[in-house]
A protein has these predicted regions:
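Glycine-rich anion/phosphate-binding loop at the beta-strand->alpha-helix junction
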Residues: 101-102, 107-112, 118, 124
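Solvent-exposed alpha-helices and their adjacent loops that cap or buttress functional pockets
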Residues: 11-15, 45, 57, 68-70, ...
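Condensing-enzyme catalytic core mediating Claisen C-C bond formation in acyl metabolism
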Residues: 123-202, 208-209
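Stable alpha-helical structural segments in soluble proteins, enriched in small hydrophobic residues
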Residues: 1-9, 87, 192-200
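A glycine- and small-aliphatic-rich helix-loop capping segment at beta-alpha/alpha-beta transitions
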Residues: 33-44, 96, 117-128
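Conserved beta-ketoacyl condensing-enzyme motif
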Residues: 1-63, 67-76, 111, 204-220
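Short, well-ordered, mixed-charge alpha-helical segments that flank or form enzyme active sites
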Residues: 28-31, 83-87, 111-115, 176-177
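Active-site-proximal alpha-helical scaffold in enzymes
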Residues: 3-5, 57-106, 141-161
Length: 220
């Protein structure tokens, strides 16, 4: 859908000029657990060679390449709930390096019985509608996927692409806090914002809107 919306046709001539970055937090964890349970209960011989490829994290990237015909850069990254954004940042780095003219950045995760059980035991899920800020009592698990086509600006304009936005910069940082801790992570967030501003050559006064990651997480 992203390629269709961008009116970008993958051909033999440009197949190596476009790459794929997939970001996923849990990947094929459900499939991995099912596969492990099968060989644990029935022995190694029960492991299917047809099912095993679906247990690796980069399975989605491989399938995207096969289905789309894209033959360039193909990498899978995992960075927790930020994996989708990380795929976009990685894609920007590849474009800046000049290795590709376009990158399909995708964020995708599936829910599974394993994830439902895990987060349920941790006590971080909610039985109600997600309340992102005030009254947050946990998040609700679900499937989700989104893709964007990020291009070199010159290449995009030359082909007459419909441009939604210009990605000026990105930043990453980390706070050494345990899962389920809602305080103490401010320094990491501040560093990430400052890094993004520096990368974009902007100041805080240049920012008109801020969109927060708010999944209703509660302290445990």
């Amino acid at each position: 859908e992203a390629l269709k919306d961008a009116d970008y046709a993958v051909t033999d001539d440009n197949a190596t000029d476009i790459g794929i970055i997939v970001g996923t937090s849990e990947g094929a964890l459900g499939t991995c657990c099912d596969f492990q349970s099968m060989i644990t209960e029935k022995g190694n011989a029960s492991g299917s060679a047809f099912k095993f490829p679906n247990t690796v994290y980069n399975a989605a990237g491989g399938y995207l390449s096969i289905c789309s015909g894209i033959k360039g850069y193909n990498v899978t990254v995992t960075n927790g709930a930020q994996s989708g954004l990380a795929s976009m940042a990685y894609a920007m780095s590849v474009l800046r390096s000049g290795q590709e003219n376009a990158m399909l950045a995708t964020g995708s995760d599936e829910n599974s019985d394993t994830m439902t059980e895990l987060f349920g035991k941790l006590g971080v899920t909610s039985e109600n509608v997600v309340a992102p800020f005030a009254g947050n009592d946990g998040f609700v698990l679900s499937d989700g996927s989104a893709s964007v086509l990020i291009e070199d600006e010159k290449a995009a304009r030359e082909r007459g692409a419909r441009i939604y936005c210009h990605a000026s910069g990105y930043g990453m940082a980390h706070s050494n806090v345990k899962f389920g801790t809602l305080t103490g992570s401010e320094a990491g967030l501040t560093n990430a914002v400052n890094n993004a501003l520096a990368d974009a050559g902007m100041t805080i006064d240049d920012i008109d809107a801020v969109f927060g990651f708010a999944n209703g997480m509660k302290a445990v």
